[in-house]
C-alpha cells in the first residue's frame, strides 16, 4: 500500500464547515492528501458573520503540535488564523525545527463579513516571526495592504507590494490575489518569487457565496506542495480548484455561503487523478 502524503493545517474553526480547519481538511481530502489539524481559535461564525472568538492559550496549541510532531511529520504545513503573538512564537519554534517542510501562510486578518480577526500588535509580529519562513504567502488585496502599508489601487502597486514581500520581509514567494479588485469579469492573481512574476487569470463568477475561498485556495496549494509539486503547478491547480468550487457553490446558509470543496472531484471525475 502506498502511504498518502500528509498536510497539516494550523488555524481556527468554523462550525458551519466553510472556512478554517474544517475547510482545509476537506480541501486536503479532495486533493488526495491526508489532513491533520491543530486548532488555534474556537470561532463561533456562520455565513452571516463572526459572532464570538475564543483564542486558545498558546500552551494548548503547543501541546497539539507536540502530539503531531512526536508521532509523524507532515509533508507540508499551512497556517491560517493565528490571533496572538504568543501562538505565533510557538508555531515558529516548530517551523524552525523543520525548515525543509514547505510552509504556506494564509494571513487571515479579516473575515469575509469584515470582522477583524487579528489585533495590530499581532499583525506587526507576523512580519517578524512567520512571514520570513514562508515558502509562499497568499494574501488578498486588503491583507496585502495591511502587511505592506500600501494602498493597492493599481497593478503598479501590486508589483510594489510583491517586491516588499520578497525583498524586504523575506518570504520566498507570495501570491497576491486579485479577487477584491474592481475587475468585473476576471480574477487575476500575481505570483512573486525571486525569479520574477507570473500571473493567473480565471473567469469571475457572479455570486455572493465565497465564504472560505482564501482558506480553500491556500489549502490546495499546501496539498500540492505536500505531493512534491513545484510552486507554479501548485498555484495553477489551486486556481482551477477554487474556480470550480465557486462555480458550483452549494448555496448553504442565509448569508455568504461556502464554496463546494468537492466540486473539482465530481465535475472532472478526478478521484484517482487528484490522489497521484
Curated annotation (Swiss-Prot):
Protein name from the UniProt record: Hydroxymethylpyrimidine/phosphomethylpyrimidine kinase
Family annotation (PANTHER family): HYDROXYMETHYLPYRIMIDINE_PHOSPHOMETHYLPYRIMIDINE KINASE THI20-RELATED, PHOSPHOMETHYLPYRIMIDINE KINASE
A Gene Ontology cellular-component term: cytosol
Its EC number(s): 2.7.1.49, 2.7.4.7
Listed Pfam families: Phos_pyr_kin
GO biological process annotation, one example: thiamine biosynthetic process
Stored NCBIfam families: HMP-P_kinase
Function: Catalyzes the phosphorylation of hydroxymethylpyrimidine phosphate (HMP-P) to HMP-PP, and of HMP to HMP-P.
Root EC class: transferase
KW Glycosyltransferase (keyword) present: no
Keywords recorded for this protein, A-Z: ATP-binding, Kinase, Nucleotide-binding, Thiamine biosynthesis, Transferase
GO molecular function: ATP binding; hydroxymethylpyrimidine kinase activity; phosphomethylpyrimidine kinase activity
Family the entry assigns: Belongs to the ThiD family.
This protein's pathway: Cofactor biosynthesis; thiamine diphosphate biosynthesis; 4-amino-2-methyl-5-diphosphomethylpyrimidine from 5-amino-1-(5-phospho-D-ribosyl)imidazole: step 2/3; Cofactor biosynthesis; thiamine diphosphate biosynthesis; 4-amino-2-methyl-5-diphosphomethylpyrimidine from 5-amino-1-(5-phospho-D-ribosyl)imidazole: step 3/3
Sequence positions that bind 4-amino-5-hydroxymethyl-2-methylpyrimidine: 45
Domain of life assignment: Bacteria
InterPro entries referenced in this protein's UniProt entry, alphabetically: HMP/HMP-P_kinase_dom (IPR004399), PM/HMP-P_kinase-1 (IPR013749), Ribokinase-like (IPR029056)
Segments crossing the lipid bilayer: none
Cross-referenced Gene3D superfamilies: 3.40.1190.20
Catalytic activity: 4-amino-5-hydroxymethyl-2-methylpyrimidine + ATP = 4-amino-2-methyl-5-(phosphooxymethyl)pyrimidine + ADP + H(+); 4-amino-2-methyl-5-(phosphooxymethyl)pyrimidine + ATP = 4-amino-2-methyl-5-(diphosphooxymethyl)pyrimidine + ADP
Amino acid at each position: 500500500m502506498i502511504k498518502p502524503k500528509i498536510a497539516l493545517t494550523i488555524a481556527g474553526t468554523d462550525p458551519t464547515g466553510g472556512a478554517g480547519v474544517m475547510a482545509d481538511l476537506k480541501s486536503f481530502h479532495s486533493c488526495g492528501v491526508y489532513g491533520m489539524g491543530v486548532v488555534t481559535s474556537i470561532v463561533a461564525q456562520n455565513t452571516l458573520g463572526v459572532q464570538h472568538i475564543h483564542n486558545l492559550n498558546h500552551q494548548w496549541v503547543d501541546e497539539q503540535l507536540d502530539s503531531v510532531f512526536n508521532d509523524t511529520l507532515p509533508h507540508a504545513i499551512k497556517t491560517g488564523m493565528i490571533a496572538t503573538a504568543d501562538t505565533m512564537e510557538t508555531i515558529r519554534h516548530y517551523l524552525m525545527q523543520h525548515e525543509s517542510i514547505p510552509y504556506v501562510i494564509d494571513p487571515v486578518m479579516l473575515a469575509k463579513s469584515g470582522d477583524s480577526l487579528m489585533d495590530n500588535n499581532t499583525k506587526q509580529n507576523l512580519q517578524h516571526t512567520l512571514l520570513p519562513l514562508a515558502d509562499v504567502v497568499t494574501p488578498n488585496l486588503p491583507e496585502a495592504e495591511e502587511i505592506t502599508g500600501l494602498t493597492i489601487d493599481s497593478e503598479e502597486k501590486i508589483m510594489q507590494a510583491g517586491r516588499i514581500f520578497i525583498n524586504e520581509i523575506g518570504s520566498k514567494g507570495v501570491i497576491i490575489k486579485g479577487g477584491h479588485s474592481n475587475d468585473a469579469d476576471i480574477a487575476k492573481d500575481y505570483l512573486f518569487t525571486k525569479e520574477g512574476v507570473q500571473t493567473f487569470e480565471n473567469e469571475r463568477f457572479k455570486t455572493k457565496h465565497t465564504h472560505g475561498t482564501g482558506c480553500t485556495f491556500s489549502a490546495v496549494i499546501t496539498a500540492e506542495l505536500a505531493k512534491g509539486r513545484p510552486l507554479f503547478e501548485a498555484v495553477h491547480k489551486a486556481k482551477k480548484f477554487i474556480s470550480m468550487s465557486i462555480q458550483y457553490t452549494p448555496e448553504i446558509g442565509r448569508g455568504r455561503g461556502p464554496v463546494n470543496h468537492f466540486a473539482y472531484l465530481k465535475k472532472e471525475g478526478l478521484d484517482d487523478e487528484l490522489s497521484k
